[in-house]
From Swiss-Prot:
Belongs to the aspartate/glutamate racemases family. GO terms for molecular function: glutamate racemase activity. GO terms for biological process: cell wall organization; peptidoglycan biosynthetic process; regulation of cell shape. Disulfide bonds: none annotated. Its EC number is 5.1.1.3. Coiled coil: none annotated. The gene is murI. The active site is at 70 (proton donor/acceptor), 194 (proton donor/acceptor). Keywords: Cell shape, Cell wall biogenesis/degradation, Isomerase, Peptidoglycan synthesis. This is Glutamate racemase.
Length: 270
């Protein structure tokens, strides 16, 4: 059995780390499309094509269930994939819904009509493509009413993180938070809508202030995945080996990933 985890680069490792801790008995195959990262500046058709190609590669590794641990892919490609492309014996899941369920205090799989929730003013920090897709607002509307979402495209943050430039990443985060707060001075909650951003969570929190609740995705996705596999064990695939695949240079990606997770990670060429 194996589950696939896909990201355009290294950000999905934050999700992988959480799901491995939650489900230590499950092998995970991680696919990073580092050669084409970042996705956040690409158009929807390009993101769709790249995400489909990566998903097929994970299916070939015996992963019948693939987690898109990439908000840009979840926002720009997932709905189209589910409507027209994914075969009936496979599943591809995104990372938005567990986050929204936590924000709206709904149980996993609660499909009751949308209702009023306590949080009325939400700041969304995401890549330009995720912001342009309005996928977060669309998913939120299925579950809650009366919530004002102010979205801030965070250009450059993913590139800085992928390049290991923490000083630049912190400066960019502060700049983007300042830009959002000019439009929404008092958000109650902030969504880190990119799986790279948990690495900058302390910077986001400091810039936003202690009164703002910051929601990060990794642990929420891990809990949701555990629940999903308990309900749908038939989608645990036939793969038996955990591995890391990349379209980039395996040595370079391995070194960055090792710094990222602070444990030795070895990528193979996809």
């Amino acid at each position: 059995m194996a589950v696939g985890v896909f990201d355009s680069g290294l950000g999905g490792l934050t999700v992988l780390d959480a799901v491995q801790r939650r489900l230590p008995e499950v092998p995970f195959v991680y696919f990073g499309d580092n050669a084409h990262a970042p996705y956040g500046v690409r158009d929807a058709d390009d993101i769709f094509a790249l995400t489909c190609a990566a998903t097929e590669r994970l299916w070939a590794e015996g992963c019948d269930l693939v987690i898109l641990a990439c908000n840009t892919a979840s926002a720009a490609a997932l709905k189209r994939m589910q409507e027209s492309w994914i075969p009936r014996d496979k599943r591809v899941l995104g990372v938005f819904v567990p986050l929204i369920e936590a924000l709206t205090e709904r149980q996993w799989g609660d499909n009751s009509p949308p209702r009023e929730v306590a949080v009325k003013h939400v700041a969304l920090f995401a890549t330009p493509a995720t912001v342009a897709s309005r996928a977060f607002q669309r998913e939120l509307a299925f579950r809650a009413i009366g919530v004002d979402v102010e979205a801030q495209p965070c250009g450059g943050v993913v590139d800085a993180i992928e390049q290991g430039d923490e000083i630049l990443a912190e400066a960019l985060v502060r700049s983007h938070v300042e830009a959002l707060k000019r439009r929404m001075p008092h958000p109650q909650a902030a969504i880190l809508g990119c799986t790279h951003y948990p690495l900058m969570e302390a910077t986001f929190q400091e810039a936003l202030g202690p009164e703002v609740t910051v929601y990060s995705q990794a642990n929420l996705v891990a809990e949701s995945l555990a629940d999903y596999l308990a309900r749908r064990p038939e989608f645990v695939g036939q793969g038996t080996e955990s591995k890391f695949l990349t379209t980039g240079d395996p040595r370079s990606v391995s070194n960055k990933a090792t710094q990222f997770l602070r444990r030795r990670i070895t990528f193979e060429a996809a």
